[in-house]
């Protein structure tokens, strides 16, 4: 989140009068630009850090709220939401555990496309093995297999939990942009004071 706030007592802010309004106008314009610059920087960092499969996560990195008052400006950049709930765990890392079932089903190579996206869920392939070209399915040693007349194929690994390492893309983008943010906000203040 980007935040700019004029801090001081009410008497000082009142003395600034119209100058304060000019400074805040310039800061608002600068913050709006920086908000969009940060979106792009986070998307660039995401491309560098994560293997892009569907593009959903990178597409969820968007400008969030933008609130401006006489003394405060706040601009946010958001990622995730909806089906992209995993954005936070990619940024910070953590352990995923099943909620309503006993195991997580992790797709193995035969159950994924070339870009690594699951072709179907374990539930779907169990309910209708023919969607994957199988005649049946079965579990053995923590693996869901698909059966064909020619043999068996491992499709999903069953896990009680999976720990993902932190793969930050938002925080590094903000750190890389810090000099630009400081420079552009200082310039906006100077321009507002000169008006």
Language model regions located:
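Short, Lys/Arg-rich flexible segments
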Residues: 1-195
């Amino acid at each position: 989140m980007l935040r700019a706030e004029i801090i001081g007592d009410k008497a000082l802010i009142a003395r600034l009068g119209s100058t304060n309004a000019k400074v805040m106008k310039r800061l608002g314009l600068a913050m709006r630009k920086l908000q969009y610059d940060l979106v792009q920087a986070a998307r660039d960092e995401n491309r560098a850090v994560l293997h892009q499969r569907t593009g959903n996560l990178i597409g969820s990195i968007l400008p969030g709220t933008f609130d401006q008052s006489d003394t405060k400006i706040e601009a946010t950049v958001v990622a995730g939401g909806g089906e992209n709930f995993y954005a936070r765990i990619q940024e910070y890392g953590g352990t995923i555990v099943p909620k309503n079932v006993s195991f997580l089903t992790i797709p193995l190579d035969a159950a994924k496309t070339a870009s690594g996206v699951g072709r179907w869920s374990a539930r779907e392939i169990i309910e209708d093995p023919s969607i994957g070209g199988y005649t049946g399915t079965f579990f053995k040693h923590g693996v869901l297999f698909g059966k064909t007349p020619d043999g068996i194929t491992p499709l999903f690994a069953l896990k009680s939990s999976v720990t993902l390492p932190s793969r930050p893309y938002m925080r590094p983008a903000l750190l890389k942009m810090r000099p630009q943010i400081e420079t552009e906000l200082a310039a906006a203040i100077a321009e507002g004071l000169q008006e």
